[in-house]
Structures are given as structure tokens and as C-alpha cells.
Amino acid sequence: KTYTVQWNLNDSAPAGHPASNPNTAASYTVLDADITVSPATRPGYTFLGWYDNPGLTGTPVTTLRTMDAENKSYYAKWDTTPITYPITYVLNDSTPAGHPATNPAANLMSYTVLTNGGGNINVVPALRNGYTFGGWYDNPSFSGSPINSFSAMDAAPKTFYAKWSSANSYTVTYTLNDGTPAGHPATNPN
């Protein structure tokens, strides 16, 4: 005989914070091996376990015992304490020395998924005298596109790297005065 398995993620409130369930078993038979129950994930929440009752009481279930020979319903329990994730800004201003960069106060140093409601968090350009800001990147090699904002639903620590180019670029042109005497052209030693 086949028995059903129902997974209740308990993720309807607040809206916009859907959970993900790695458990795919929708049914089992008594002849099946016991099934190890995996934790669910939900951005901004800590998973506290699967319970066999909607009141979320007792001990969390870690194994679906197939010898029980009955339909099963499991309920996810979440810690709703907001989780705060750090944001690190690497200013890349050590060379040349004497040109420190500043990170505007408008840039958040951390974010909380539940507080920020899943919206976008903007990243403000840094400032450095004599340099043009080329953007914040999520990698030190500056590959990909610059980051102007990110989703609070990313629910992970962030590190952004500042890219700079010199704002004071000059072109030097040498004009050689080699018109006379004839046959003796001037040369540029540079």
C-alpha cells in the first residue's frame, strides 16, 4: 500500500518570503527504506525543524519512518527573529598613497531581510579626490557589471569592491623644432 506525505511550509505570512523544500517524497510504501528529512530554507528565517503536528510541539522529525504505515503531514517551524547580514565595502584606495576614498554614510553596513521587506537596497558611489568612481563590483577582478542595487531577498553577506580610474589624465605632445639646419633632424629622447 502507498501512503501520502504532505509538506506544509508555513510560509504564507508575511507574504513575499517563500520557503524552499528540498524534500520531494510525496508518497512512500512500507517496503521503502526510511527517508531522511532535510531542512527547508526561507530567506531571512532560521529553520527550526519539521513537526508532525500543526501546533509545532514535541520533537522535530528527522526521519520519515516507513514502518509507521500511515499518511504523513509535516509542518515547518521558523524562527521569525530577523537575521541581519553584513555589507563590506572594499575601497581599494591604498595605491597611490595619499588619495583616501570615502564611503558615503548612505551606504548601509548591514541589512535585514524582514525589515527591508524584500525590496532593493541601493549602493551609493564612493568618493576619492583625483579619481573617477567606476562602480561597485561583487568581485575583486571587477568582472561583470557594476552593482547599483541588490535584493534584500538575497539573504547573504555582501562584499563590494570599488573600481577607480584616474580623473587627471594628461596627454603630453612633443613638438620638435627641426627645420634648420637641413639634414640634422631633432630626436625626442622620451
Regions found by a protein language model. Give the residues of each.
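Secondary-structure capping and domain/repeat boundary segments
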Residues: 1-190
